[in-house]
Structures are given as C-alpha cells and as structure tokens.
C-alpha cells in the first residue's frame, strides 16, 4: 500500500477518499489530498494532527473498500447486535454466514459482517487493485460466488474469473480488453453484484428469478482482461521496467496521447485483435496504417493468441 501525505494526488488518494466517504465523511473524490481530506482522515482514524496514511491506517480503512469486516464472537453475541454494532443489517450478516446458527454462535469463532453500502462504485477509476478488493468483498458477502483465475497477466496479476450458477448452458462475459475502456469493468461487476443480491433476497432481477437462472446457466465473468494496461492508463502504474518500456513504445507514436490513448496490453499488443478469426485481414489493415510493431493501440501481435 502506498503511503500518502497532504499534497499527494492521484488514484491512491481517490481510493482513500472513497473509503472515507463510506465511513461517513463528506469528501470529494477528486484525488487531491487537501485540507478536507486531511480532516476526514483525522475524524475517522482519531489521529488529530496526523494526516499521514501508512500501512496501519490503510488496514483500518480497507474494510470500506472491500465492503466487509470480520467480527470475533463474544459471549452473548447474536447476528442482530453484531449487525447493529457495525451499522449494517442482519440480513446482510445472514447472507454472508450461511449455515451458521444465529442464536448459538461459538465464542471465539469469526463472523463475516458486510458493511451497509453497495460494493461496486461507479465514481472512481478502476485498477487491478480495486477490482481485487471488490471481488474479495463479493465473495465474502455471497459465499456461493465461485472465484478463480484463468491465468496471469504479463506483470503477474491474476486474471480473475467469477462463476454464477451451475447450469448446463455456459455463457461468458468479459470486460476491459482495451486499457482505456475500463468503464466496462464496473458495469460487469455491478451486474454480478445486483444479480447476487437478488438471489440472496429471493427476488426478481430484471424480470428474471436468479435461482432459476443459476439452475439453467453457468455465467462466467472475467471483469479485467487487461489489468496491466488498465493500471497504466488509470495511474496505478507510474514507474518501473514495464512503465518505462510503455513510455518508449508510446514515444514512437506521438499522435496518441499517453497514457490516455493506450489501448494495448503492457507489451504493446492490442488484445482485441488477437483472435484467430480475421487475424490475417486485421494484420494487413493495421500494418498498412503503420501499426506494424508494438504500439499503444492496433498492433495485432506476431501471431494470434500470442499475447
């Protein structure tokens, strides 16, 4: 976690501000660590005169980004007072702890407590970091959500997959093939969140009953296909070998703004042009346009499925 101080700017500050908002503070998500953000940090963390956000402070704020906290059961605890203690609902606590006898909790055991706000935000840029927090939070809130990976990115980031349902008909959805189109990631995650919530509440979602949907279909969601590229565009990746190489690649295409115009993966290959179908035609077209080498966009790669 990055240490933050007054005067800092960027994506990390926006995530700090999102956590503070969810903790009840009135701060803008402007990515500027100014006086109001400083005051909110002091209010939430009880650290008057100390605005620095280091590892210990992040650990206290992370539940507001992951959307849940864990509670160690004490004598006399039941779901209702636990929910009240964390200003959430008993229904949320019950959904996160299936099979647990709410009236006979074991002292010393752990209860997952979802906090009382929607987990998927549409107000901040997405990165591999935020996506990972959200997926962790969704699985904590809805333990029947199946989470896995389909591989790793060039930089080693997990390519997460979510499975909703166990039906015979398999359907796949994905998001953020292009690095500067990361708005698709929260769209897909919000779809998953709303569908899981409707299933837990035993109510309809968009004129469908999720229980029936999950019996007939297996939905596979890959919410962040290009995490390295997204991290570059949205300001999480700002240094190191891969960043410097991206800068060198971009320097050969001065008409494409950097990093905002970057669509490719971190190696300069456009993942959306990596499919075997029509690859030779795409290669001919893009090479004629000058994208015949690693580029911020439109380079098809050396062969299909090679990136």
Where are these regions (language model features)?
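Intrinsically disordered, low-complexity Ser/Thr-rich linker and spacer segments
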Residues: 47-50, 55-72, 113-126
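Active-site/substrate-binding loop(s) of hydrolase catalytic cores
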Residues: 168, 182-186, 190-307
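Short glycine- and acidic-rich boundary segments immediately preceding or forming the N-terminal edge
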Residues: 3, 81, 92, 112-155
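Short, well-ordered surface patches within globular domains
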Residues: 35-38, 55
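Conserved hydrophobic/aromatic packing and binding residues within compact polymer-binding modules
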Residues: 17, 41, 93
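Short beta-strand-to-loop junctions in surface cap/lid or active-site-entrance loops
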Residues: 160-169, 176
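Primarily a LysM-type cell-wall glycan-binding module
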Residues: 1-18, 28-35, 63-87, 109, ...
